[in-house]
Regions:
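Acetyl-CoA-dependent GNAT
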Residues: 6-82, 87-89, 100, 106, ...
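Conserved beta-strand-loop-alpha-helix junction that forms the acyl-donor binding cleft
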Residues: 117-128, 144-146
Length: 153
């Protein structure tokens, strides 16, 4: 494991056959596991939703530290943060925030992009406060048991 710190440069990189196993090894803390699907499940889901799934590994310098996936529906001009996870060893270092800033810049380049949506399961340990700090606000809508939030771009 490489040494990473708050000063590490965050980048989004393609998931390839060379880094796939490293991405599969990333895990959230046990108490967070019911809030986000595993990276294996996310990548499998992306395979079946190829037309809209855009996913990347989150790197801090040369170390894979997380994963994100976007529902990138340019036809409908709908952009939804589908997955976001940072490995438990690398949480609280600002990597998720930096990765989302990169994602915001990417989504701004997409056709008709005016906002980014996200959803979360409420409860202790949920990412609600994290998303609020990044400017997401509740839409008043639900998707199943998940609360939907939006952030203007």
């Amino acid at each position: 494991m490489s040494q990473v710190s708050r000063e590490s440069k965050v980048a989004l990189r393609e998931v390839t056959k060379e880094n796939l196993r490293d991405i599969f090894r990333l895990e959230v803390a046990p108490e967070q596991s019911h809030f986000v699907a595993t990276n294996e499940m996310s990548i499998a889901q992306a395979y079946f939703d190829r037309e809209i799934a855009w996913f990347r590994a989150i790197y801090a310098d040369e170390t894979p530290v997380g994963f994100l996936m976007l529902s990138d529906d340019a036809k409908e001009h709908r952009y939804f943060l589908w997955r976001l996870m940072i490995d438990t060893r690398y949480q609280k270092l600002g990597f998720a925030k930096q990765a989302l800033e990169i994602l915001f810049d990417y989504v701004r380049t997409r056709p008709g992009a005016k906002e980014l949506l996200v959803s979360y399961f409420p409860g202790e340990g949920s990412p609600q406060g994290f998303y609020e700090k990044l400017g997401f606000v509740p839409t008043g809508e639900m998707e199943g048991d998940e609360i939907i939030m939006r952030r203007e771009l």
